């Protein structure tokens, strides 16, 4: 195996990347190798989908399936080798189908194809053993013996960025938001990466193209969520348990949460959100259910302890999943969509009766704990409605600076930086936050500035789109560029969604972003230097030193 896509990958002076029997995330070498073959197969599918598009052939089923399958290889999503093999087999079938259609269309048009790349001609071996034997040939760092390490690094930046965008495409698709133009662009990029490009300039340009494409995807996802569930409104959420039977919903999928809420009505079951599902409470069409009683737990890395202590059924709708056998709760855990763990029950479709049965069989919480309320729901509409009041406070000198502090959380001790940063931020500053990094500080008290809360929870990781809209509105009001605003982004990364959001911000021209806790292992020192120079990206350091630098600018 060789996997270097997440922040927790092995990174020592001698070794970079997970290349032993098991990755740091818990996936086996077998699963990692099968995922490499799946990605290579999907690049072949994208080649033929791109050619098909040129002949006016658009296959909605394949367009919608391909990013979803790619999503299954994102960190902490699918650990089940059988499921990965099924996806790879499906990719081979779709590739053959598209190839036949393209060759027929090409013959009818008397326009033979130019040279077909190896990734498009690849034939999947007949059995799992043969597939695993083939896997080293399509490892994500293939060609490392003859290709400069900077080329490998930029290929991976593009691949992982596109993987993050594919995840958001799937989240949007679940809410019936699709775009043939975006699918076409996705396939073009995926197919091109399958040809193992070597030009550094083209690869860097490709990363920016991915960032801009993802901006459109986030816009599409924002529309899907708000059209379906209403615009988020500031809402108080209890983060302590209440007495009763219970179901915990983790991941990102609001559609699944809605179905669970509908199917548990009148059954005496309380529903809790976990992790990135916390922002669900701000959506009117979800918050209207009285048995959506609160949020349980914190960020993904704590789930083995928190899930073990949860006395009900648990549904994992997307990333991030950890080994459920550690806390011995695998028998009451259910996976959805592209999520998988060997031996864990998987739910197809929208019937959650098995989850409800499991919840009723568990003891549930035996008593109410004292309420602790936090506020969520400062999405795009709420932020834009508050913009005039915020602008007025800026003009009066009561708000001196804005910080966006958020992103993925993780285990490393260095991540305490983000807690310390928010606590040290002066009282005349506003802090926007999003994604699971917020759990480092979202239960703390920050007060307000003349009625405007100093901590504004914007939502999930994809709700970076909302923060961008506020920044654009402020820039327009003050007649300046985004980089001239008293606004600083302080981001934490862990996996590929965070990578593509960073690419989106770069592509939109946002500079001076602070990132941490460590640099991606797949980026060489030279590439990091290039990115720092081109985008003025900064690494987090000492909290007070960083604050002094930011506020003195």
UniProtKB/Swiss-Prot annotation:
Which Cys pairs does UniProt list as disulfide-bonded?
none
GO biological process: one example: response to hydrogen peroxide
Superkingdom classification of source = Bacteria
Q: Which GO terms describe its molecular function?
A: 2 iron, 2 sulfur cluster binding; hydroxylamine reductase activity; metal ion binding; peroxidase activity
Cofactor dependence: [2Fe-2S] cluster; hybrid [4Fe-2O-2S] cluster
Q: Where in the cell is it found?
A: Cytoplasm
Keyword hit for Oxidoreductase: yes
Listed binding positions for [2Fe-2S] cluster are: 3, 6, 18, 25
Task: Tell me yes or no: is DNA-binding among this UniProt entry's keywords.
Answer: no
What keywords appear on the UniProt entry?
Answer: 2Fe-2S, Cytoplasm, Iron, Iron-sulfur, Metal-binding, Oxidoreductase
Q: Which SUPFAM superfamilies match?
A: Prismane protein-like
Q: How is the cofactor bound?
A: Binds 1 [2Fe-2S] cluster. Binds 1 hybrid [4Fe-2O-2S] cluster.
Residues recorded as binding hybrid [4Fe-2O-2S] cluster, renumbered to this chain, are 252, 276, 320, 408, 436, 461, 495, 497
Q: What GO cellular component entries does it have? A: cytoplasm
Q: Which reaction does it catalyse?
A: A + NH4(+) + H2O = hydroxylamine + AH2 + H(+)
Q: Where is the signal peptide?
A: none
Which NCBIfam families would you find in this protein's record? hybrid_clust, PRK05290.1
Q: What is the annotated role of this protein in its UniProt record?
A: Catalyzes the reduction of hydroxylamine to form NH(3) and H(2)O.
Protein name (record): Hydroxylamine reductase
Organism listed in the record:
Vibrio vulnificus (strain YJ016)
- Write the gene name: hcp
């Amino acid at each position: 195996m060789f996997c270097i896509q997440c922040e927790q990958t092995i990174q020592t002076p001698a070794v970079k990347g997970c290349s032993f029997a098991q990755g740091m995330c818990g996936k086996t070498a077998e699963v990692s190798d099968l995922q490499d073959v799946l990605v290579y197969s999907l690049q072949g599918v994208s080649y033929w989908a791109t050619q098909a598009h040129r002949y006016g052939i658009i296959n909605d089923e394949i367009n919608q399936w391909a990013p979803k399958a790619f999503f299954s290889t994102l960190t902490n999503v699918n650990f089940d080798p059988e499921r990965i093999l099924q996806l790879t087999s499906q990719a081979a079938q779709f590739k053959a189908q598209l190839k036949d259609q393209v060759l027929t269309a090409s013959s009818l048009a008397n326009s033979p194809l130019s040279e077909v790349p190896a990734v498009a001609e690849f034939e999947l071996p007949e059995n799992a053993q043969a597939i695993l034997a083939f896997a080293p040939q399509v490892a994500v760092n293939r060609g490392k013996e003859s290709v400069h390490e900077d080329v490998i690094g930029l290929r991976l930046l593009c691949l992982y960025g596109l993987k993050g965008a594919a995840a958001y495409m799937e989240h949007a698709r679940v809410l019936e938001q699709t775009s043939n133009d975006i699918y076409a662009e996705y396939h073009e990029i995926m197919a091109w990466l399958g040809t193992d490009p070597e030009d550094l300039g083209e690869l860097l340009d490709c990363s920016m193209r991915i960032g801009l494409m993802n901006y459109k995807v986030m816009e599409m996802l924002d529309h899907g969520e708000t059209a379906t569930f209403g615009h988020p409104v500031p809402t108080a959420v209890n983060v302590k348990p209440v007495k009763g039977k219970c179901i915990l919903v983790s991941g990102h999928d609001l559609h699944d949460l809605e179905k669970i809420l509908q199917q548990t009505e009148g059954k005496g079951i309380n529903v809790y959100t976990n992790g990135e599902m916390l922002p669900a409470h701000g959506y009117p069409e979800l918050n209207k259910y009285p048995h959506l009683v609160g949020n349980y737990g914190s960020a993904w890395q704590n789930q083995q302890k928190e899930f073990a202590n949860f006395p009900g059924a648990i549904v994992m709708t997307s990333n991030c999943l950890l080994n459920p056998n550690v806390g011995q709760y695998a028998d009451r855990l259910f996976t959805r969509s592209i999520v998988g763990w060997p031996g864990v029950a998987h739910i197809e479709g929208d019937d959650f009766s098995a989850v409800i049965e499991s919840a009723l069989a568990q003891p549930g919480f035996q008593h109410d704990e004292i309420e602790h309320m936090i506020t969520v729901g400062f999405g795009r509409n709420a932020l834009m409605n508050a913009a005039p009041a915020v602008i007025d406070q800026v003009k009066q000198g009561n708000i001196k600076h804005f910080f966006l502090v958020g992103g993925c959380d993780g285990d490393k001790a260095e991540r305490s930086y983000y807690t310390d940063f928010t606590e040290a931020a002066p009282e005349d500053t506003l802090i926007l936050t999003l994604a699971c990094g917020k759990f480092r500080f979202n239960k703390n008290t920050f007060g307000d500035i003349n009625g405007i809360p100093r901590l504004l929870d914007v939502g999930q990781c994809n709700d970076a789109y909302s923060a961008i809209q506020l920044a654009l509105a402020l820039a327009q009001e003050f007649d300046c560029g985004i980089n001239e605003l008293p606004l600083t982004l302080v981001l934490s990364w862990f996996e590929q969604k965070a990578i593509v959001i960073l690419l989106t911000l770069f592509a939109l021209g946002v500079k001076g972003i602070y990132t941490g806790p460590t640099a991606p292992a797949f980026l060489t020192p030279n590439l990091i230097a290039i990115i720092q120079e081109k985008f003025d990206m900064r690494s987090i350091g000492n909290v007070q030193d960083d604050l002094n630098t930011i506020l003195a600018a």
